[in-house]
Amino acid sequence: MDTWEDDRVDQRACLICGDRATGLHYGIISCEGCKGFFKRSICNKRVYRCSRDKNCVMSRKQRNRCQYCRLLKCLQMGMNRKAIREDGMPGGRNKSIGPVQISDEEVERIMSGQEFEEEANTSWSNNGDSDHSSPGNAVSESNQPSPVSTPSSSRSMELNGFSSLRDQYLGTPGPTHYQYLPHLFSFSAHPTIIPAQSRSLDPQSHTLINQLLTAEDIEPLNTPMLIEDGYKVTQSELFALLCRLADELLFRQITWVKKLPFFCDLSIKDYTCLLSTTWQELILLSSITTYSKQIFGDLTDVTSKYSPSEDELHRFSEDGMEVMERLIYLFRKFSQLKVSNEEYVCMKAINFLNQDIQGISSASQVEQLNKRYWYVCQDFTEYRYPHQPNRFPDLMMCLPEVRYIAGKLVNVPLEQLPLLFKAFLHSCKTIVTKE
């Protein structure tokens, strides 16, 4: 397996400048030049300046013209600075899968040098070099992706959900201080990844994808979601329906795990640990892909027959608002990408195989399995979509958002879930209608 994966790396382009990649460095596929530049910048605590608009084109020929924009793109693409030891010695500590997502505020602190000043007052002995780590898992050390800051007004979208519902039932304008469309999927206005040439799909990728497709249950959901015309759904009835739906989706994820092609490779203890940590994320992924027709069709019709009270609207929490806006953006992103079944099953396996979860006894084996499907997904996207060079990074950057949303959902009071899903589904229906 390692030989095949190493061969696949040789065909990759550096995600920073488009030069030929030499391997997985600090969590992402990159060339030796960008690997060394990032390491020197972090170890030497460099603070750069851009003489233009902080949006310089990064390419093999132009990457040395602006060090500020080069380091900025390293951070935006997910290079993990915490995987570098200040003494430059090897021996990685923070092995993770997929790029590390950090907030705008944290990026700004690094670029301005403030982060280095703060770290100077703390111990640096825990840092380690991860040149040989697999692609990073887009989670922080606490196993939760970093929150994504709100974008500038020029990149925000009008939310058609909660604010319009509030206006409808209260007759007053909704709050205007919320910003939507987190920026985390937009890396640069200038794509720099070299488009893949037309080629065939690797036979091993084809086999592994077919195995995942076979494990997926694509049968329609059994939970009844049909309501007579004119019937008014109460909050408790909608909540009970959401619970039944969640139960069925969870049962399907348990069945899915038992059908995975690598089920015999891990212990029951590790599977239990992985599933107990990722089940909400798996349900979310399957809801916006495999079962989206029923979720955004039948369930939307049910929620439309539920009218929240004035008190429910007033008591809707900040956590509920944040979860809703992120759900809307995730739905829009999946709709724009038109995520295929093959990509979905790979993303689901990658998300499930998170070796950073505490309590796993075979973390290295989980990591190798994760790397396998990381390469399979990249191989497939480059084969199926050769003219969309940024597609694979876009897909992978959806995963930290899925994890963040799932983690935030537990903070939303149970009694607010009916309103949350009504507003979310109403907004998504509006988005689909406009598009």
Swiss-Prot record:
Compartments where found: Cytoplasm; Nucleus
Main location: cytoplasm
Induction field: By retinoic acid.
UniProt xrefs under InterPro entries: NHR-like_dom_sf, Nucl_hrmn_rcpt_lig-bd, Nuclear_hormone_rcpt_NR3, Nuclear_hrmn_rcpt, Znf_hrmn_rcpt, Znf_NHR/GATA
Keyword terms: Cytoplasm, Developmental protein, Differentiation, DNA-binding, Metal-binding, Neurogenesis, Nucleus, Receptor, Transcription, Transcription regulation, Zinc, Zinc-finger
Cited CDD domains: NR_DBD_GCNF_like, NR_LBD_DHR4_like
GO molecular function, one term: sequence-specific DNA binding
Secretion signal span: none
Tissue specificity annotation: Transiently expressed in differentiating cells of all embryonic germ layers. Expressed in an anterior to posterior concentration gradient from late gastrula to midneurula stages. Shows a complicated spatio-temporal pattern of expression during neurulation, being predominant in the neural plate and neural crest in midneurula embryos. At late tailbud (stage 30), mainly expressed in the head mesenchyme, gill arches and tail tip.
Polar residues bias locations: 121-141
Keyword Cytoplasm: yes
Chain positions covered by the region annotation Disordered: 84-158
Described purpose of this protein according to its UniProt entry: Probable orphan nuclear receptor. Binds to a response element containing repeats of the motif 5'-AGGTCA-3'. Required for anterior-posterior patterning during organogenesis. Acts with chordin to play a role in patterning the midbrain-hindbrain. Isoform Em is required for integrin-mediated cell matrix interaction during neurulation and for the morphogenetic movements leading to formation of the neural tube. Also mediates the effect of retinoic acid on primary neurogenesis.
Name of protein: Nuclear receptor subfamily 6 group A member 1
